[in-house]
């Protein structure tokens, strides 16, 4: 295959590429029309602040860079031709149903002739949400044309050269704050670099617009978002999906306003955190925060991390003769985060599942999510075990297949456990309801007639309130139900309730809830070489009733390190023709074990 690929000759006509965001904006090279989210009279507030001695106004431009997903496993697909023109595709994809649709479109066949299966991926981070589709389609086309199994795998160079990255953003902003530290108005235009064609850029930009407030209440806001067309690879989803870019802009603006007013940025942040309710507890798109977690987390972390005393220690160290002589400086900062959980495209917030109870008491669970190392399968195993009342060892998670659970949404938007877990719980509830009357019959005796509503499934055994000393095994109930022709297979469906968003008005309730947290980061920088080391990190994150604390801690730590890499060392470089120069580990550097904070 590689020898054949080398024989292909491509003819093209060179053009002057548009690569810089600012230049592309100036050239009016856009993929989309502007989106808007508005609250209050921004122009009035900015004008009033400009004319007042009691306020400060800042304006400027802020950029965020690209980032490569760098999964351990590159894009890979195996297509197998089956009878009657059907195709089975094993794909490293976060979105099997979309991959199924693209393969069917390329082959010119209906969806029911294509099955996509994903057992697991070697990393995704959003890079396999939509961009896995092309390689699956190429493999499927090869299988359809030759009648033979076709395998497509990108080597690292091709993967990094040909696939999209985290969207670079350019923000142009004006903001006003009273000299008392109270935020007044924020006018910001967010431009995302979508590359040469439109992938998920419109939705990425939309989420950035919803997160450019981060954790802070602005009485007046005007947010413009637009996708810019450049002659680069088509940029795609990446962990956070525009949220980190919006948050970065928010924190830059807070820092600039605080310094312009001569105030402590830490105090400004604390003063403007969202409240639980009322106007100060409502986002610029109209969703109420609903609780006071941000302020609680802030106060708790400030205390547990000894932030204020450590900040004094940092200032003293920087003033020491040793630090001055060595040209080294330390810094410490505390920042919050508020991240909305749900797809902002409302209809995607749905999931299905199929749960089968076998006659030996073991359970098979099918769902539409995909495992990419984030711990989805173990969490959903725990959900199923708890819902069915069986040991974790009785649960078997099956590979994700579009012919078993169809019409799925991508495993993205931090929604995989919520959506698929809800569907699994619904299926398990149906099965318990079917099995309870059977169990009640088995548990009845000694003149006591057990009813179905008093049956309890727990840890692989079944009991009843009215006969506390009597138990039967879950396997016995399953075998008896099968003999009595009770269905031991059930689908489940879940859709996130009470969410909506109107793009025309820029208002709605797009998120089921917010994940909130805060971090204190202490760093040391060599003022001569620029070398940086993270000395200590304290993170406090509200995980709710955590299903698996170890998995959640791993996600928090991994997310921090990946974000640290994005803002400190990972730099995607394109040449003057738009070719990716950082196409291998030799030229693109991600955090190593030595870069992990010394003290977590």
Go through the PLM ranges and name each one:
Residues 1-296, 300-303, 310-600:
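Cofactor-binding beta-sheet edge motifs in enzyme active sites
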